[in-house]
């Protein structure tokens, strides 16, 4: 990724709920783009970007969110590393599409739970 330090600085200005929303949005974009083999490089870039977003978010997240995000980051790293070889196969694209959609939805759920907990003072 180009200008990663500038992206990180800007990203870290957002609160946790915004960052989790950004991770969920990126995963939704991966889900949407992964079905088209012509978009494989864009998907690979989004996978890498989401790995960074998670790396920068984990230190500020509650333990349950940290655990979830680290597991997601491991899977993202595997998809990212292997995507050039995997993307031509429609089955692999479908697996990534489904996985990233489910993880996006789970991230949004965690975001809502985290916001509800922090706003209630718990």
Residue ranges and their predicted role:
Residues 1-122:
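Surface-exposed peri-terminal alpha-helical interaction modules
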